[in-house]
């Protein structure tokens, strides 16, 4: 995993989220500070940021890298590929609503082009210490079926419940929505032998539907890439983007073909 660290609230929240996930999974953590080319002062600043991050992560074994790039999102994507990280964690942009995700240029770039999964922390995020549940946003399409298989295995490995949530925005056949969700629950059982919880959130739009759902402290929301995503790239569609902006928990977006 790689955390994009900046000297602001979003950077600290990304760092806290990355550390929490590392403690749960036992994975390797790299903290990166991106600086523009031809800027010696910014390079020094990046090193200072990493030193600051190191103090905050005294109990978490981590690597620290200052990396030169013309854009933070691009730099994190290149660095993740170079060190074979399978997850990039970033924080919300300044000025967003507390408890919700606000995308800046870095997050927006990653959510449309990243070669690896991207996790975004809501504004004001503070870890609870325990991972309580994985929730996968589900619609009936191949990328989501692949994600059901992967997330059911992840839930089994991590020892946490898996919830499959879909949205009834009163524009589709509600019976078909529930039938599709039942098939996804069956897929989770066939893949990993776990009984996934099925949840249909109803509302006149995505934000309203998200408000009706129950969210636990320590929960993660996962979204599959859009059908428009290139192979092995993240691309967030319109519905998923609305979901991300309304989510009160950290959100992970998987690249197409995620393994």
Where are the language model's segments positioned?
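Short beta-strand elements of ligand-binding domains
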Residues: 89-92, 117-124, 251-255
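Active-site charged/polar residues at nucleotide-handling catalytic sites that mediate phosphoryl
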Residues: 83, 216
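Small/aliphatic-rich secondary-structure junction motif
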Residues: 1-44, 58, 132-178, 182-199, ...
């Amino acid at each position: 995993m790689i955390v994009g660290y900046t000297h602001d609230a979003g950077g600290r929240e990304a760092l806290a989220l990355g550390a929490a996930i590392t403690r749960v999974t036992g994975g390797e953590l790299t903290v990166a500070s991106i600086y523009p080319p031809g800027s010696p002062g910014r390079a020094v600043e990046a090193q200072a940021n990493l030193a600051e991050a190191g103090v905050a992560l005294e109990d978490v074994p981590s690597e620290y890298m200052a990396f030169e790039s013309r854009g933070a999102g691009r730099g994190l994507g290149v660095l993740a590929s170079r060190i074979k990280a399978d997850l990039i964690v970033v924080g919300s942009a300044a000025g967003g609503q507390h408890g919700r995700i606000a995308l800046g240029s870095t997050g927006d770039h990653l959510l449309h082009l990243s070669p690896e999964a991207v996790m975004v922390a809501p504004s004001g995020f503070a870890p609870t210490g325990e991972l309580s549940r994985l929730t996968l946003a589900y619609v009936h399409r191949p990328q989501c079926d692949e994600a059901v298989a992967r997330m059911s295995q992840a839930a089994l490995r991590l020892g946490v419940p898996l919830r499959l949530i879909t949205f009834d925005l009163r524009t589709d056949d509600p019976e078909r929505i529930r039938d599709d969700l039942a098939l996804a629950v069956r897929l989770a059982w066939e893949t990993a032998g776990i009984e996934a919880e099925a949840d249909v959130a109803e509302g006149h739009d995505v934000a309203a539907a998200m408000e009706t759902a129950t969210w636990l402290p320590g929960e993660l929301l996962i979204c599959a890439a859009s059908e428009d995503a290139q192979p092995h790239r993240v691309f967030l569609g319109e519905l998923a983007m609305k979901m991300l902006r309304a989510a009160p928990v950290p959100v992970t977006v998987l690249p197409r073909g995620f393994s």
